[in-house]
Amino acid sequence: MQIYMVGGAVRDRLLGRPVNDRDWVVVGATPDDLAARGFLPVGRDFPVFLHPETREEYALARTERKSGRGYRGFVVDTAPDVTLEQDLSRRDLTINAMAVRGEDPAAWELVDPYGGARDLQAKLLRHVTDAFREDPVRILRVARFAARFTDFSVAPETMALMREMVDAGEAADLVPERVWQEIARGLMEAAPSRMFEVLRGCGALAVLLPELDRLWGVPQRAEYHPEVDTGVHVMMVLDMAARLHAPLAVRFASLVHDLGKGTTPADVLPRHIGHEQRSATLLADVCERLRVPVECRETADVVAREHGNIHRSAELGAAALVRLLERCDALRKPARFADVLLACECDARGRLGFEETPYPQRQRLLGALQAARSVDTAAVAARAQARGAAGPQVGEWIRRARGDAVQEWMAAQPPAAGT
């Protein structure tokens, strides 16, 4: 029985990056061999075990053979005679198909049958063998790695193979949950726009997210958007979210906030009147199709519907600000509203020449929210009921009280913040 550290841990060590997770492959063993040594079986689709002390994953060396379309159509062989080279050959990229012999990190003996170290030096994302085409999830993984390794490029032959897979309908067969899983991971990388540029380049974006793909080539008014192209703008917004270390919900909202601009009638371009509601409608379809988690879905919906009003909030008086807070459900969900405002800041700064421009709307609305939440709604309701108010009338009393509190807060602000 031989044990090898494989995959991302080897790659990251060669790159001088921190190694957070280590994966291991065991050659020449059976499930019974590992169980006898105290390893705990956890794999459902193929034999994976947890080390009895480190709890790291150890998998039996395996081969895979395509048996159908999509992500799940595989026959797996984990016989003891499967070699390390055979196991590495099924991996997606050469930089992920390297191994180190043994469990002692000091005894560094690299096994690199497919030129992964060479491609690391050349900063290339290259597929290992033609078996790459057997798993369409690899299209998403390559795009995600492009977002992580920002100075790497996709090898031309790998991009060509990905296009062939898309043309053959493989991308359309992907399981929605897996598509979302990979997109979510890509959104959290250093340069998430690169993921979508790669997906667009191979044609997969038009299959997986056609609502997003159609934004490229759609013009916006140059006085507000010097970058003009809506697709370019959305990628700038997304990268601004990464620059500001935004959480996943904000990054997803940044990605999908302008979907409605892709359906603007050609005869009114470059104006996009009413695109906010169209964006929200398209977003609902995307979230249903990809089964996007509720937190991401709700944050993105508020951003899609209200980002224009939030941008213009400096023009609003106290009563209108309270109505905006209510539409955003900010009084009940202040933490989510903070995420909404961060996404709107990314939108405003994700424009050519506006990257360093302050966004005072964010602090102004957070201040207005704090003032509105300071109102003792129970006391206001009691006064209203004492004067004969009931039902919606009580709500109006509370709304007016919040407006008064916001007005008082605005009056106390310096002119730049309160007007």
Swiss-Prot record:
GO-annotated molecular function = ATP binding; CCA tRNA nucleotidyltransferase activity; cyclic-nucleotide phosphodiesterase activity; magnesium ion binding; phosphatase activity; tRNA binding
In short, the EC number is 2.7.7.72, 3.1.3.-, 3.1.4.-
Task: List residues of the HD domain.
Answer: 230-331
Needs which cofactor? Mg(2+); Ni(2+)
Q: Does the keyword Cell membrane apply?
A: no
GO BP terms, alphabetized: RNA repair; tRNA 3'-terminal CCA addition
Q: Bound how, and how many: what does the cofactor note say? A: Magnesium is required for nucleotidyltransferase activity.
Residues binding ATP are: 8, 11, 91, 141, 144
A Pfam family annotated for this chain is PolyA_pol
> Which residues are listed for CTP binding in this entry?
8, 11, 91, 141, 144
**Is Nucleus given among the entry's keywords?**
no
Record key words, sorted: ATP-binding, Hydrolase, Magnesium, Metal-binding, Multifunctional enzyme, Nickel, Nucleotide-binding, Nucleotidyltransferase, RNA repair, RNA-binding, Transferase, tRNA processing
**Miscellaneous information on this protein:** A single active site specifically recognizes both ATP and CTP and is responsible for their addition.
The domain section of the record reads: Comprises two domains: an N-terminal domain containing the nucleotidyltransferase activity and a C-terminal HD domain associated with both phosphodiesterase and phosphatase activities.
Its biological purpose is as follows: Catalyzes the addition and repair of the essential 3'-terminal CCA sequence in tRNAs without using a nucleic acid template. Adds these three nucleotides in the order of C, C, and A to the tRNA nucleotide-73, using CTP and ATP as substrates and producing inorganic pyrophosphate. tRNA 3'-terminal CCA addition is required both for tRNA processing and repair. Also involved in tRNA surveillance by mediating tandem CCA addition to generate a CCACCA at the 3' terminus of unstable tRNAs. While stable tRNAs receive only 3'-terminal CCA, unstable tRNAs are marked with CCACCA and rapidly degraded.
Oligomeric form and interacting partners:
Monomer. Can also form homodimers and oligomers.
Q: What is this protein called?
A: Multifunctional CCA protein
**Gene name in the database record:** cca
